[in-house]
């Protein structure tokens, strides 16, 4: 059985993710107390469920101590367990709570316990509680994602087979800031920029004309080779840490041309060595065709 645990910061997008998983054919349970995870998962497997997703919202360190114990037991039973952790910047979380006028769960809990927590304090406390989870989870920063983009990325995550180590190559634009969840960051702003070619400016690194332009530049090929060599050298050491996910971010100025192309090429390079996911932070959902590089 495939089991996906959806968790993360309050306001990070867990509800959207769990709805997308349900639409993808998963048997979904929202807001499950961690102590019920093991018996429910065992029962689902016994009843022949092939794919299930459970959303867990931790409000104390003890919650995930129970969850980790359950996950170890499930893995020993041969159940394919993966954790999807959704996060966002403090500013974006504040905006989302203000927009929906909902109270943060930890603020409500603190009130019942006779204490007061501001929204900023509740968010900071939640980050502290959830920090250990990020070491074994696939972390997705939803700060600049539209709901449609988040649903698309969840679809991609589901399609990706489980592997001992999954590499995520993520392009981004420096003018919008670095992604929150990044293990390695490579700056490709020194490469020739298609933006200054009028016919290429409105296109992206997924378009064949831009890809052709960059493929003909020796510096681009050299940069890709150097990044690939670095990753290949250190990949065994990351595997040795029993990590499940490694996020490699590639940045250019706007996240539209160079970083997109380089991320795509690196994803192809490592497709045979690990599970790979390629995503492009700066591109809106309507600029993400299934495969614009098919002509290469």
Language-model-detected regions and their locations in the chain:
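Compact, charge-rich alpha-helical regulatory domains located at protein termini
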Residues: 1-12
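Conserved phosphate-donor/acceptor-positioning beta-strand/loop module used by diverse small-molecule
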Residues: 77-102, 140-143, 181-194
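Conserved nucleotide-sensing/catalytic segment adjacent to the nucleotide-binding pocket
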Residues: 22-75, 294-296
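Short beta-strand-centered segment that lines the nucleotide-binding/catalytic pocket of NTP-utilizing
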Residues: 7, 25-40, 274-285
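C-terminal accessory "lid"/substrate-recognition subdomains
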Residues: 119-246, 271, 282-288, 293-296
């Amino acid at each position: 059985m495939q089991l996906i645990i959806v968790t993360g910061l309050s306001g990070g997008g867990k509800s959207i993710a769990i709805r997308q998983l349900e639409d993808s054919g998963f048997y979904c349970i929202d807001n499950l107390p961690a102590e019920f995870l093991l018996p429910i998962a065992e029962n689902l497997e016994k009843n022949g469920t092939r794919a299930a997703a459970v959303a867990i919202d931790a409000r104390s360190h003890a919650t995930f101590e129970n969850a980790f114990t359950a996950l170890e037991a499930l893995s020993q039973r041969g159940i394919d367990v993966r954790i999807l952790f959704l996060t966002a910047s403090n500013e974006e979380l504040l905006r989302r709570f203000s927009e929906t006028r909902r109270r943060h769960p930890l603020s409500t809990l603190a009130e019942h316990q006779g204490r007061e927590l501001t929204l900023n304090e509740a968010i900071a406390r939640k980050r502290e509680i959830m920090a250990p989870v990020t070491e074994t989870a696939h972390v997705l920063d939803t700060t600049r994602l539209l709901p449609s983009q988040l649903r698309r990325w969840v679809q991609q995550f589901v399609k990706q087979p489980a592997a001992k180590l999954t590499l995520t190559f993520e392009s981004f634009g420096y003018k919008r800031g670095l992604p929150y969840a990044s293990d390695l960051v490579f700056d490709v702003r020194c490469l020739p920029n298609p933006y200054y070619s009028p016919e290429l400016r409105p296109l992206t690194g997924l378009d064949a004309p831009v890809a052709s332009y960059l493929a003909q530049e020796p510096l681009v090929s050299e940069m890709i080779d150097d990044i690939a060599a670095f990753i290949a050298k250190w990949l065994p050491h990351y595997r040795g840490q029993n990590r499940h996910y490694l996020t490699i971010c590639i940045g250019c100025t706007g996240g539209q041309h160079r970083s997109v192309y380089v991320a795509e090429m690196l994803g192809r390079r490592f497709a045979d060595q690990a599970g790979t996911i390629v995503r492009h932070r700066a591109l809106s959902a309507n600029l993400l065709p299934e495969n614009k590089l098919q002509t290469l």
